[in-house]
């Protein structure tokens, strides 16, 4: 009996010990958790008690060897300071232009990311390995310090992100000033897309493509390729299309081993109100062209680069012709020196386009500069048929035979429909018809108008339950489109400046003086 009681008490005590041990483990875990939370709270209190940190831009070390450097030059709070570097940072780990955090006593305690805000500036010239001259948005020159990551990669014309207070360039913005003015990819326009200009296309292919497709023959005959081509003529007749097709044809002919580049420079975008800026941009464009032309190819062949100046008369005017500015007296010589100056221009061809060739300085158009001059005339009847066919393919819904439809439109477009009478001082009056102002751009617009009329007719037919669906573009649509196009052209150009009429009409005598213009309007 006593033994049974003793065993029962012993078992009860064991259970109590197990419960106490379990409770003790829980208390220990709670105590550990409380200690951790207390440490976190103490750390937060210490962090809140710390003074505010200051950020600065690292300018460089003050010692001789990176391994032993613990002094640094930083720019902070509007002044340059020499500060200490925390032992927790690896020696030599800081880079010029990097943002750093300064702790108590202005000690560098943390290396942060590079500065990513600031002003944009254009690099003009390198000064050694770590400095450069830039031009800011106000046109002022400034000497800045290049960040370590930029010292081997930037070149003249690049756009840099500059921290204005410290004067450190921290990043290259991947859009150079030349890239803002040019388009280096090859246009997707072929000669087959151009109608009515077979003669002009043949001339420019002989002038531009042959030197690159058959360089061995040119070397054999000691013949230098032309440096430039001038495309001139009335507006809207395909000058820009021809230039794009040249670049595309060269790219296709030479293949991937020596791709061509097409730098499309819009004349007005080169203009700048600051003295010397336009000339500098021209230098940058030709410098970029030389770099592209000198890039090695897979088979060692030549890499053609085409610089296309659109609206050339806007910037390269005859020297001395300026009324409120004499800008052309320095801009024109800059182009002349690039074309045939001391620095050789190899594998680079300049193509200019203008509809006011009489305004361009004669020195630019002499042989040795723009060697080839090709006039792009207004399309003839046959040329108009080819242009209609380019914009009006068989796949477009139409009524009847497409060829007959195009012939009808051409006859309507070239019908005798008087537009204006020009009165000359020393010659008989001359009647100009609407056909005298036909251009490729006008034909393209006529086709677009006819397509819109056909679409509207199809939509109207779809809303009504009766009637057959329209067959597509009809002769009536083309007639309406031609009439609308000619009606809109009735007062463009206006009679306010009679000389403008003589300049846009081919065949007018150069010495003829227009004394009056009589608009005759559209005849039904």
Curated annotation (Swiss-Prot):
A Gene Ontology molecular function term of the record: ATP hydrolysis activity
Classification via SUPFAM superfamilies: P-loop containing nucleoside triphosphate hydrolases
Keyword terms: ATP-binding, Coiled coil, Nucleotide-binding
Biological process annotations from GO: modification-dependent protein catabolic process; proteasomal protein catabolic process
PROSITE patterns (alphabetical): AAA
Residue ranges that the Swiss-Prot or TrEMBL entry lists as coiled coil: 4-50
Family matches, as InterPro entries: AAA+_ATPase, AAA_ATPase_domain, ATPase_AAA_core, ATPase_AAA_CS, NA-bd_OB-fold, P-loop_NTPase, Prot_ATP_ID_OB_2nd, Prot_ATP_ID_OB_N
Residues that, per the record, bind ATP: 236-241
Top-rank lineage group of the source organism: Bacteria
Presence of the UniProt keyword Coiled coil in the record: yes
Nucleotide-binding found in the keyword field: yes
Family annotation (Pfam families): AAA, Prot_ATP_ID_OB_C, Prot_ATP_ID_OB_N
One annotated Gene Ontology cellular component of this protein: proteasome complex
Subunit structure: Homohexamer. Assembles into a hexameric ring structure.
NCBIfam families, sorted: pup_AAA
Family: Belongs to the AAA ATPase family.
Protein name: AAA ATPase forming ring-shaped complexes
Annotated organism of origin: Corynebacterium aurimucosum (strain ATCC 700975 / DSM 44827 / CIP 107346 / CN-1) (Corynebacterium nigricans)
């Amino acid at each position: 009996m006593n033994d049974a009681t003793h065993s029962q008490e012993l078992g009860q005590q064991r259970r109590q010990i197990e419960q106490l041990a379990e409770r003790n483990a829980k208390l220990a875990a709670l105590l550990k958790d409380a200690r951790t939370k207390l440490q976190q709270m103490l750390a937060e209190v210490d962090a809140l008690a710390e003074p505010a940190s200051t950020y600065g831009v690292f300018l460089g070390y003050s010692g001789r060897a990176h391994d032993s450097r613990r002094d640094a030059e930083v720019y902070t709070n509007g002044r340059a300071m020499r500060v200490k570097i925390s032992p927790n940072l690896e020696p030599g780990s800081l880079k010029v232009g990097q943002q750093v955090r300064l702790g108590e006593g202005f000690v560098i305690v943390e290396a942060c990311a590079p500065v990513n805000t600031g002003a944009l500036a254009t690099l003009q010239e390198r000064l050694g390995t770590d400095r450069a001259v830039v031009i800011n948005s106000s046109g002022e020159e400034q000497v800045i310090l290049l960040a370590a990551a930029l010292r081997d990669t930037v070149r003249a014309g690049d756009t840099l992100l500059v921290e204005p207070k410290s004067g450190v360039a921290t990043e290259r913005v991947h859009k150079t000033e030349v890239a803002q003015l040019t388009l280096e990819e090859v246009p997707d326009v072929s000669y087959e897309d151009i109608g009515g200009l077979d003669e002009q296309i043949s001339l420019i292919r002989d002038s531009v493509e042959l030197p690159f497709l058959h360089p061995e023959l040119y070397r054999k005959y000691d013949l230098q390729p032309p440096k430039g081509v001038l495309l001139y003529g009335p507006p809207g007749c395909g000058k820009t299309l021809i230039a794009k097709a040249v670049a595309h044809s060269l790219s296709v002919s030479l293949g991937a081993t020596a791709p061509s580049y097409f730098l499309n420079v819009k004349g007005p975008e080169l203009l700048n109100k600051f003295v010397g800026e336009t000339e500098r941009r021209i230098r940058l464009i030709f410098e970029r062209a030389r770099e592209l032309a000198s890039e090695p190819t897979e088979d060692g062949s030549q890499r053609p680069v085409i610089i296309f100046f659109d609206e050339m008369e806007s910037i390269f005017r005859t020297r001395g012709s300026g009324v409120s500015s004499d800008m052309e007296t320095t801009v024109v010589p800059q182009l002349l020196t690039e074309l045939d100056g001391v620095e050789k221009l190899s594998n680079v061809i300049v193509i200019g386009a203008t509809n006011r060739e009489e305004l361009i300085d004669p020195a630019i158009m002499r042989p040795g500069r723009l060697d080839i001059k090709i006039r792009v005339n207004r399309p003839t009847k046959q040329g108009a048929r080819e242009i209609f066919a380019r914009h009006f393919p068989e796949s477009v819904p139409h009524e009847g035979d497409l060829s007959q439809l195009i012939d009808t439109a051409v006859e309507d477009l070239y019908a005798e429909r008087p537009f204006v009478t020009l009165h000359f001082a020393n010659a008989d009056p001359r009647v100009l018809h609407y056909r005298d102002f036909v251009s490729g751009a006008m034909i393209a617009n006529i086709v677009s108008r006819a397509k819109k009329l056909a679409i509207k007719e199809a939509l109207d037919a779809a809303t009504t339950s009766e009637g057959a669906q329209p067959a597509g573009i009809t002769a009536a649509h083309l007639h309406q489109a031609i009439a609308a196009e000619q009606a809109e052209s009735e007062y463009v150009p206006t009679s306010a400046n009679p000389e403008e009429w003589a300049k846009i009409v081919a065949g007018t005598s150069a010495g003829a003086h227009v004394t009056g213009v009589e608009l005759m309007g559209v005849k039904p």
